[in-house]
Amino acid sequence: MTCCNQQSSQPKTTTNCAESSCYKKTWRDFRGTRIERGCGCPQVKPGIKLECCHTNECNN
């Protein structure tokens, strides 16, 4: 599976993953809205929005 792995609003980059899902985490801090993308579907702390999906590059 191919997942996007760029941070926040950086240009799109992808990585090949062994997992069958991709994730996109969104949260706010003193720098504004932060976005992290990657492979799998991790546990997150309260206050962090997590979206998991199961198709190539679905987490852009």
Swiss-Prot record:
Molecular function per GO: acetylcholine receptor inhibitor activity; potassium channel regulator activity; toxin activity
Disulfide bond among keywords: yes
Cystine residue pairs: C3-C22, C17-C39, C41-C52, C53-C58
Keyword list, A-Z: Acetylcholine receptor inhibiting toxin, Disulfide bond, Ion channel impairing toxin, Neurotoxin, Postsynaptic neurotoxin, Potassium channel impairing toxin, Secreted, Toxin, Voltage-gated potassium channel impairing toxin
One Gene Ontology term, aspect cellular component: extracellular region
Tissues expressing this chain: Expressed by the venom gland.
Subcellular location(s) of the protein: Secreted
InterPro entries the UniProt entry points to: Snake_3FTx (IPR003571), Snake_toxin-like_sf (IPR045860), Snake_toxin_con_site (IPR018354), Toxin_cobra-type (IPR054131)
Protein task: Binds to muscle nicotinic acetylcholine receptor (nAChR) and inhibit acetylcholine from binding to the receptor, thereby impairing neuromuscular transmission. The recombinant protein also barely blocks voltage-gated potassium channel Kv1.3/KCNA3 (2.71% inhibition at 60 nM of toxin).
Family the entry assigns: Belongs to the three-finger toxin family. Short-chain subfamily. Type I alpha-neurotoxin sub-subfamily.
Protein name, entry field: Short neurotoxin 1
Organism of provenance: Hydrophis lapemoides (Persian gulf sea snake)
Organism ancestry: Eukaryota, Metazoa, Chordata, Craniata, Vertebrata
